[in-house]
From Swiss-Prot:
GO biological process: vesicle-mediated transport
Compartments (UniProt record): Golgi apparatus membrane
Keywords from the UniProt entry: Glycoprotein, Golgi apparatus, Membrane, Transmembrane, Transmembrane helix
SMART domains, per the entry: Cg6151-P
The organism of origin for this protein: Aspergillus clavatus (strain ATCC 1007 / CBS 513.65 / DSM 816 / NCTC 3887 / NRRL 1 / QM 1276 / 107)
Annotated gene: tvp18
UniProt protein name: Golgi apparatus membrane protein tvp18
Residues modified by glycosylation: 11
Major localisation: Golgi
GO CC, one annotated term: Golgi membrane
Topological relation to the membrane, as annotated: Multi-pass membrane protein
Family statement drawn from the similarity comment of this UniProt entry: Belongs to the TVP18 family.
Role summary: Golgi membrane protein involved in vesicular trafficking.
Transmembrane stretches, start-end: 21-41, 43-63, 88-108, 110-130
Amino acid sequence: MTLAEEFRSRNFSIYGQWTGVLCIILCIALGIANIFTIHVLRIVFSVLCLVSGLVLIFIEVPWLLRICPTSSKFDAFIRRFTTNYMRAVMYAIMSTIQWLSLLPGSGASSLIVAAVFLLIAGLFYALAGLKNQEFVGSKTLGGQGLVQMIV
């Protein structure tokens, strides 16, 4: 299945996964960009955004668990997020954390962009769950075809 066919399938988990890839890029970039500030609270939220981006890499690109040396506890933690609802909850939590970066003392920052896109990805996964769509991983990002080729 090509990338265009995946998008035409109208499976919201595919949309969620690709929005998640965008979230990875945004979380890592914005986490690094906002860490250089004098506001201590913003530094904390920047680190949380950076950690979120790194966790999302392993969740959204499954073949990385096979090629990167990680602990069995970390692998078990990542494998919890295989359903649409679990991913929706995870994205909602990550988004809420970034929305909290607007608290007084931290000031408004570009971390809000990460919060918005994390929320959108969570909504895609929630819609997939509500429509009873099975979680389908993109073949481009390491769906069943690529994982079987690596093994």
